[in-house]
């Protein structure tokens, strides 16, 4: 039996994590087994869990995915990043495996694992993300994500190869054939020795025309994130993305 599903693309500008993010630029995946798809995008500011991965600069991103019977899918992606001199990484790669279940006519669930790789980094910044999500009509999605071997650097505090988690709530509301409203918020519990976390949220518009999609988002974080990471990575910012889906 065919399992209908919708996938997030590799770009993660919206609320972040594995959603993310544009983390809520959704591509429809047909029910035919072993389908290929993908996207190429230019993003004005690459943001994950409220933090800029390019320090406010643009990012080029690309991703491909393949769906299989019974709700399985595989994906891979790449993006340009600027994580600062202490990491010195210019590229981010990811590999993803996911399983999606339909739960009646209204609900669906997904479990995924993503490995993030920084091939030219200083040190070992690679990490894994295990995420589970529950969606209602593909309009409202709740996600919890667990991060293993993640490293976080801030002003005066460093977590090296530690564990962290995030929770996110995302909404997608079509208002016409081409326009949709996007919104979301989440909480990221930072790894030890931070002993704290921060809130992040976003609101925006998406316009789609054939294989093209244009998004404009307003993203913000709470004061804790701004104090830890500075305004070049955290705080209020605009992010726009132009994507071609194939």
Located regions from the model:
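Residue-level signature of outer-membrane beta-barrel architecture
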Residues: 44, 66-68, 99-101, 107, ...
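Short glycine/proline- and aromatic-enriched beta-strand/turn motifs that initiate or cap beta-hairpins
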Residues: 33-84
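Repeated loop/turn-to-beta-strand initiation elements of outer-membrane beta-barrel proteins
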Residues: 36-38, 70-76, 105-111, 138-144, ...
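Residues that define the transmembrane beta-barrel architecture of outer-membrane proteins
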Residues: 56-60, 89-93, 107, 124-128, ...
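Detector for outer-membrane/organellar transmembrane beta-barrel domains
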Residues: 125-190
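Cleavable N-terminal export/targeting peptides
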Residues: 1-35
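Outer-membrane beta-barrel "beta-signal"
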Residues: 173, 203-212, 218, 232-246
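Transmembrane beta-strands of outer-membrane beta-barrel pores
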Residues: 42-48, 78-82, 115-119, 136-138, ...
């Amino acid at each position: 039996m065919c399992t209908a599903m919708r996938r997030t693309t590799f770009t993660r500008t919206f609320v972040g994590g594995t959603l993310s993010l544009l983390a809520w630029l959704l591509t429809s995946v047909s029910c035919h087994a072993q389908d290929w798809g993908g996207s190429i995008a230019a993003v004005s500011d690459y943001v994950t869990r409220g933090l800029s991965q390019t320090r406010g600069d643009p990012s080029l991103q690309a991703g491909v995915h393949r769906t299989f019977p019974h709700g399985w899918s595989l994906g891979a992606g790449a993006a340009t990043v600027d994580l600062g001199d202490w990491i010195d990484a210019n590229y981010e790669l990811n590999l993803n495996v996911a399983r999606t279940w339909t739960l009646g006519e209204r609900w669906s669930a997904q479990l995924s694992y993503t490995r993030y790789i920084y091939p030219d980094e200083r040190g070992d910044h690679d990490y894994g993300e295990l995420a589970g999500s529950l969606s209602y009509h593909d309009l409202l999605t709740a996600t919890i994500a667990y991060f293993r071997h993640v490293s976080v650097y801030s002003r005066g505090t460093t977590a090296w190869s530690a564990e962290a988690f995030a929770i996110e709530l995302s909404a997608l509301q079509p208002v016409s054939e081409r326009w949709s409203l996007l919104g979301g918020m989440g909480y990221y519990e930072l790894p030890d020795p931070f002993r704290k976390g921060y809130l992040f949220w976003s609101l925006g518009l998406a316009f789609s025309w054939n294989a093209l999609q244009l998004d404009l988002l307003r993203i913000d974080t709470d004061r804790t994130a701004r104090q830890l990471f500075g305004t070049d990575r955290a705080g209020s910012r605009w992010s726009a993305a132009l994507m071609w889906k194939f």
